From Swiss-Prot:
NCBIfam families: dephospho-CoA kinase. Pathway: Cofactor biosynthesis; coenzyme A biosynthesis; CoA from (R)-pantothenate: step 5/5. It holds the Pfam family CoaE. Belongs to the CoaE family. This is Dephospho-CoA kinase. Keywords: ATP-binding, Coenzyme A biosynthesis, Cytoplasm, Kinase, Nucleotide-binding, Transferase. It comes from Chlamydia felis (strain Fe/C-56). Its main location: cytoplasm. Residues 6-202 form the DPCK domain. It comes from the Bacteria. GO terms for biological process: coenzyme A biosynthetic process. It catalyses: 3'-dephospho-CoA + ATP = ADP + CoA + H(+). Its EC number is 2.7.1.24.
Length: 202
């Protein structure tokens, strides 16, 4: 049995998941991001890349790379297409996270393994983790963060949010809930408390 506590951070769009992960990493945890993992293996000439092109069309490739803006425009107002894309990507993302956990645990260098997985519950992946941390923020706060960061419209925010299950449902299952309607410094203090509590959990 591997003795490294395996923790997932999840939450709605622009709730502050990535910022919380950054704090955990600053404190010494190993952090992996599902979004970054998918970006790393999604290349046009790979097996998965060919499947994505077959699904979405060759126009998603620009200058020999996937154009993520074009992909987003195709899938975020088409739930069937979005779910088909996720069915291609998510199994590989989960496989890589599991593989990385085994490698990191054997190194025995880190106090915690943290995986940022936005759709943790939606893809039925929560049972693979020892603890789940849910980052929450109210809708107006999240919308303002999203539009400020991306320059996208409110409509785009709501289209992307449609893929997430309700926050109330996730709150019923999460082990730890961190409210993030305040400043980054306030979030840091909360994350620090849980870091030290989790560090001593095994």
């Amino acid at each position: 049995m591997l003795d490294l506590l395996k923790v997932s951070i999840t939450g709605d769009l622009s709730s502050g998941k990535t910022e919380a992960c950054r704090v955990f990493q600053d404190l010494g945890a190993y952090v992996i991001s599902a979004d970054k993992v998918s970006h790393s293996f999604l290349v046009p000439h790979s097996h998965i890349g060919h499947r994505v092109i077959d699904l979405l069309g060759s126009d998603v490739v620009v200058d020999n790379a996937f154009d993520r803006k074009v992909i987003a425009e195709k899938v975020f107002d088409n739930l069937v297409l979005l779910q088909a894309l996720e069915a291609i990507l998510h199994p590989e993302v989960c496989r890589i996270i599991e593989e990385q956990y085994c490698l990191v645990a054997k190194e025995n260098k880190y106090p915690l393994f943290i995986a940022e997985v936005p759709l943790l519950y939606e893809i039925q992946y929560a049972n693979k983790f020892d603890r789940v941390i849910l980052i929450t923020a109210d809708e107006n706060t999240r919308r303002e963060r999203f539009t400020r960061k991306t320059n996208c419209s409110d409509l785009n925010f709501y289209q992307r949010c449609a893929r997430f299950s309700s926050n109330e449902e996730k709150m019923m299952h999460a082990d730890i809930i961190i409210e993030n309607n305040g400043t980054k410094e306030e979030l840091r203090h909360k994350v620090e408390e849980y870091f030290y509590a989790l560090k001593g959990a095994l």
